[in-house]
Amino acid sequence: MGARRESGLHSFLNRKTPPTADMQQGSGGTRPQPFSRFTYGSKSAQSSGGMGGQVACSPKGRGSQRSLLSSNFPFMESVFEDRTAAPQRTPTPRDERSEYFGEAEGSSGLRSSLQCNRELASLDKINDAQARMVVVAGKSHLGLYKFDEAYRMQQVHDYMTPGSLGGGTKFSSSMRRNMRKISTISDVKAGFHHHKNYIAICGTSTSVSIYDINRASAKDSPLITTLSEHSRSINSVDFNMGQTHLLISGGQDGCIKVWDLRSHSYKVNRSDLNFNSGSDSVRDVKWMPTYDFASLGADTSLCSSGRSNKFASVHDSGLLLTFDMRQPNQVERKINAHSGPGLCMHWHPHMDYIISGGRDGKCALWYVGDKVNSMVSVPQGHNSATSYSINTAPITTGYLETVINTSHPVSKLKFRPKYVHNMLNSLIATSSMGEDSDVTIYSLARKHIPQNILTTAAPSLGFVWWNEDIVFNIDKQSVISAWDIRYEPTLLDNLPKGIVKWRDMDGSGLVFVAQEKGTYSMDNGGVTDSVGKGAANRMSNTTLNSTNNMGRDQEVFTYSFQQQYKHQDQEAADRESDHDKELEKERETEVDQHYHYLREQEREHHQEYQEWEHEPFGRHDDHQGNPQTDFYSHAYSDRPMLSKALSTYSSKIASPILSYYGAQTLSHHTSIVSNSPSISGAALEYPGGIESPIMITLDLPQVFGSVRASRLADRKTSKNKGNAPAVRESAVDIFKYLVRELELCHVQERNDPKSISVDDRSKSLDDTELKIQLMENIGLSEHNTWATLIRSTTSMDTNDPAGSHTQGHSKLVDMVKLQGSNILSPDNSDMEDDLGDKLDEMGTARLQENVNHLVGLIFLSTHNAETYASVNDLQNFKIWMLIRDSLLNDLKEAADGSTGRRDASGGAANSDKNGIYTTTSTVNHARQDSITSNFSSFEPSDISRSDGEEKLNLGRLSEQNLKATNQNTTAKLDDTRKLASSSSLNSSEPLLLLEGGNQAKEQSIGLSDLKTCLKERYTASNESVLDIEEESSATVAYSSKQANTECSSSIPIRKTEARTSFIDTIMTNLRSPGLSHLDVDNDAIFGKGKTSTSLGSGASKRSSMHSTDSYHKRPYSSPITYSKITTAAQKAKLGLADHDGLPNRGSISFLANIDAAHADKLLLGKLGLASSPDDGKLLPPWDTGRLIQQLYRYSVETGNIILTVCIILLFQTMYKVTSTRIVKSTLAEFITILHRYEMFEISAHLLKNCPWDDILGAGSGQSTVRLFCENCGKLIVNEHSKTILSKRHQAGESNMTNFGYWYCDSCRKPNSLCVYCEQPMKKLALSFLNCGHGGHFECLQQWFLDEGMSECPSGCSGVLL
């Protein structure tokens, strides 16, 4: 956009004929260079010795003393530019601008900028059209800057530097010292008319300094006087526009002082009027302006004498006060405008409106006209005292018309000095505190979208409207810039007409926004439409989540504008002069339409106005109470309120913006609906002509779910389970259902593995029954090794003393640490026997722990698979079945490991040390023979039943299947496994040395032992391997066939051949990815005439899946030494020449040329095995840890939140899925999502069972809860009572327990009572989201849990449980 803006501006500057006079080239034929946000063209400050005739002379003599409340004031023609003195830039409509702007619609409206070398704080314009000057004040700087027609600025004088005063004038040292020392400036203002050469500055000092800019060349000092009656720093100062001799100031001491520059009071530092607000600091004070709009076709009758007598102030407490000097003993209006400190305020140029800004980031527009006083009787007391306190003044009326919400505290705001017929067409410029470096211009007709944003390089410190189009601004980088808003692009110019965005989890789809851009102005048609539809609308006001809109009712709004427009339009119709004839023609249609509309509204509502005005204040049908309460309830309850969710409101005291008029006197327990009419379509809230945007949503999961459900409907052969819910239509409902039904965490994961005792005797009979049921489901017989182990460990837990296994395990670990590598030395045979016993004892204990954990994970995986099956999510169902199958394989290996360990410990005749280590190594090789395993015939994917219900068929393997296996074949298979384990480079000896803690001998046992072992065993076992494999394959195929036949009699299953598990189906290609790219010489391996026997018969899927070629490629069935090495790259890796062939079967001498580490890396890659970085173990592709890792990466890449959290919580402790930092961050974000969907019970369960305690604080400290009193509507702070109770507590009284936020210091009433016991809620309390009621935790526990109730105790209609 920046490039387009610069190119457009360049094309505009190079045009030959500019459209307006002031666009011509300035002196010297130069134009301002293009200006960027971060680069400023620094111009040298030029000083002149004198100001010539550009500045009017100072009045030489003072006039006679006049009354302070004089009603005569001059017209303010000097405020506006002299049209004859300088060419006026005529406003160019956007369609005309396109002729010379071309594509430069985004060109900047910045006219010029000037870098100053002094610190700046505030600025104002010199109210002389011919002067073309602004005054800028800062710390030790008070400069006067002049600009030309092209708004190029230069410094004229610096009144804090004596050298710049010119003429070689000599000053005394005291005078020079007074001039150079100046405090930090808070405000600077210039006078009007006869005092337009006066400048008043104020700051951190307690005085107001007044300078005369015409005394630049005089011998005396430009400092006229110093007003020092304030006791603290002064925040604001302002000159009166009508009575130009009046000056007003307000400071931190809470005093507002009025000074008359004609009298002698200011010479003795005594103010003429003093208004004391106590300790409430004054942040800003302004006189009511009296602009002269007569030359612009305005009604001069509005410029009455009363306007120059009024002023307003905004205070630290958020109060907005209006005063009238003719009644100095009282506050005209006292409005609680902001919930925090008020920072600034400004009057409308010609209407009775005030806009205020505060630290709460709100710009509130208030109507303070006389029409309010005509309907509200205000006591007219008279007192001769000129100083009084406003602390006792009651909160009075003030109509809030609209609120502009900003994201930063509003420090400066000013109305655009332009006459408008419609209040909504007024522009407001604002600047904020902090790092927001923009000056934002809003239109009241479009308060949510700014019209212009003047982007500056540093945060703005202040700005001023030079006229209705030019804005001067200063920032923290001491840069003065001039902007022309007519050439500044609006936000609507860059606003796309259609928007397509991705929705969040609430919809998980697309959202389309179609809208008309509209404009920033309000036409008459819009007023008619919006006001006419306000009377019929009603708004409900609930107790907790209520929406209340503030503003004046439509009748008062129309009536107040009637009186103004009736005179203005009539006067405008009668006036047609030469200089404004063109303007009157443009306004003629608008005036006629608006006038007729007001007449029609007046006739229509005249009777209603009379009844409303003359109705007694004390009479009201809906409210009972004292006259003051009824007055507020009647007069202002019909005013809509600003949106704010509060528990309740009161109508007795007018509260801040957050809880203003329209309050209800009834209790929130009985009052649900308000009788207040809503003017949601009123002119000040929703301008006409701007249609509301249309939002269209597309729920993609719902669409895809419907398509998937329609396609799967024809394939269903059975109905859903009886207890399974129907398919949800909403993605949010599915998310909530899955989170509630899935087992997200395992309870054992919460405990530290080091603190888990093996002999935990807390296991009940139910745990044993669950394990027996699992044995029956997976087909293990009662006499199986794992079943025997379960019974033995159960009885052992009952009889064995506590801590025996744990102590044995700790002793064994200590022994291994002390002995180190000497345990396996030949001289320690006795110690090896003891180590064998200890190893067996430790293995049994650890095996029991692993078995218990695996059993729990298997149950959880099965439950999660069933949950996904209930919602027809087949993809996640298969994932969890895949996890369960892998866990079942680990469970079987644990049982096989226990058998091998017992055989090794009981076989004393076997003197070979490799006997123990070989069995241990066999356990570490996960699923070495999955094809011959009985688990391979397990059918977890069969989810159908003959009875028509969709159910997970876990299958069964009978006891006869285990007995049918030939014992001789099993013995041969054991030898084959030993051979396979010893044939790999990761031999059993280095593996056990790593497990025993001796890593030093890993290098000593190298290729020599491996080559010797291979030479001795290969020749004798080469032929037997094939025979054993073929025999076992045929036996397993026959056994599987027989098992399916026998199981069909007891369990209704499909009559199909043996099917493969998910592991065999999905991971077939992952068996040996490295060997799949090598050509295997079958003749060299099996010999001539030998073929492999198929594992299945007939048309079985298993036989087609495991063909002879794929079967020979398995790493545990075909030795790697007999693969063909065909390519030169493969030969180079193995150290072979191109002419070298494969060695014969009896020789493996080529291995001597291969480095051990290189061979390990090469062969592990060819075998498709991964080496664990922690312990160096080999991990096959179907290893559970690798499977969990792959599923975790898949869930993260696809954005499956639930699957990711489940994997982390269930398997992080056992399989180390990812880093702990990522786990904690993921859980914290997931808990935030659960809180967003109000699933607090699931979140509490996760926090209770997760093993990371620091997750418990996730999301804390990020929310701010603000409590408002339901009686007075004010923010509950209770600082006063806290101070008192703290002092008493320090004195020895123990009464701090009474402090809390259950009461309000302002109204001295309890905030809310318990709905059960009707007592103040001092302790732990709960609140209902449905109805907003609350009560003590103990009371609600008794009501819902003990008494079994489901409704709210207050008797409301909501069912909570």
Curated annotation (Swiss-Prot):
| UniProt WD repeat ranges | 180-221, 229-269, 277-315, 337-376, 405-452, 455-493, 849-890, 1146-1192, 1240-1278
Q: Where are the zinc fingers (RING-type)?
A: 1314-1356
Q: Source taxonomy lineage?
A: Eukaryota, Fungi, Dikarya, Ascomycota, Saccharomycotina
Where located? Vacuole
Instruction: Report what the protein is called.
Output: Restriction of telomere capping protein 1
Keywords attached to this entry? Metal-binding, Repeat, Vacuole, WD repeat, Zinc, Zinc-finger
The annotated regions of Low complexity compositional bias extend over 1091-1101
Predominant subcellular localization, coarse grouping: other
Tell me which Gene Ontology terms the entry assigns under biological process.
positive regulation of macroautophagy; positive regulation of TORC1 signaling
Domain of life the protein comes from: Eukaryota
- Name of the coding gene: RTC1
Q: Where is the composition biased (Polar residues)?
A: 39-48, 64-73, 958-971
Q: Which Gene3D superfamilies match?
A: YVTN repeat-like/Quinoprotein amine dehydrogenase
**Could you tell me which residues belong to the region Disordered?**
1-104, 564-593, 896-916, 953-982, 1091-1113
Question: What GO cellular component entries does it have?
Answer: cytosol; GATOR2 complex; vacuolar membrane
**Membrane-spanning residues:** none
Q: Name one GO molecular function term.
A: zinc ion binding
Q: Which family does it belong to?
A: Belongs to the WD repeat RTC1 family.
> PROSITE patterns per the record?
WD_REPEATS_1, WD_REPEATS_2, WD_REPEATS_REGION, ZF_RING_2
